[in-house]
Regions:
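Class I S-adenosyl-L-methionine-dependent methyltransferase catalytic core
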Residues: 1-182
Length: 182
C-alpha cells in the first residue's frame, strides 16, 4: 500500500510500502504534526534511524532538507528505501546504511558534520524500547532529535526526561513524539 508524501515540493506523490505487519510507517497525521512543530528543515542534514519505508527522510527532503542518512538493518526494507528515493530522483541526496541502528557510532556514518534533525522510530512492538539519548550528542547546535515511542507504555527514560523538562512529549494516538532540542 503506497504512502503519500504530506508536504513540500513532492506533496501528494506516493512512496511504496511493503504489505507486511512488521513495518509500521509513521502516520500522515503524525508526520504533518512533526514538520509543523519543526517549522522548516531547509538545508538540514537528517539522520533517519530504523527507517522502515524511508518516508521521514523523503518528507524532510520534500520540505527542503539537503541530505538524508538512512539506517535500516532489514535488507528488504533497505532495498525498498533505495527504490523509493530513486523513483523520486532523490538518490543523490541519500546515504544508505544497511546496519542495526543500535550498534552504530557516529564515526561509522562518516558523519563528522553532525545532524540538524535525527528521527528514530524503533520497532517498539518487537523489542524493548531502547534508550536513544546517546544520539543527542550527534546533533549540531540548535538541532532536534525526534523519537517515536509507544503512547501507552512510554519508556522510563522518556518519562524522566519529560518530568525534568529535557524533552517535550506529543501524543498522536498509539504513538508519541519525544522531542529534544540541542
Amino acid at each position: 500500500m503506497p504512502i503519500r508524501i504530506t508536504g513540500g515540493l513532492m506533496r501528494g506523490r506516493n512512496v511504496p510500502s511493503p504489505d507486511t505487519s512488521k513495518t509500521r510507517p509513521t502516520a500522515s497525521r503524525t508526520r504533518e504534526a512533526l514538520f509543523n512543530i519543526l517549522q522548516g528543515v531547509e538545508g538540514f542534514r537528517v539522520l533517519d534511524l530504523f527507517a522502515g519505508t524511508g518516508i521521514m527522510g523523503i518528507e524532510a527532503l520534500s520540505r527542503g532538507a539537503s541530505h538524508v542518512v538512512v539506517v535500516e538493518m532489514a535488507h528488504a526494507q533497505a532495498r525498498l528505501v533505495l527504490q523509493a528515493y530513486k523513483s523520486l530522483s532523490l538518490e543523490s541526496k541519500l546515504t544508505l546504511f544497511e546496519k542495526n541502528a543500535l550498534s552504530l557510532d557516529k564515526d561509522s556514518l562518516c558523519a563528522t558534520e553532525g545532524f540538524d534533525l535525527i528521527y528514530a522510530d524503533p520497532p517498539f512492538k518487537d523489542m524493548d524500547y531502547p534508550d536513544l539519548r546517546p544520539y543527542w550528542e550527534w546533533l549540531n547546535p540548535g538541532g532536534v532529535a525526534v523519537f517515536e515511542a509507544p503512547s501507552r507504555n512510554l519508556p522510563a527514560w522518556v518519562k524522566e526526561a519529560d518530568e525534568a523538562g529535557t524533552v517535550q512529549v506529543r501524543r498522536y494516538g498509539e504513538s508519541s513524539l519525544v522531542i529534544y532540542r540541542a
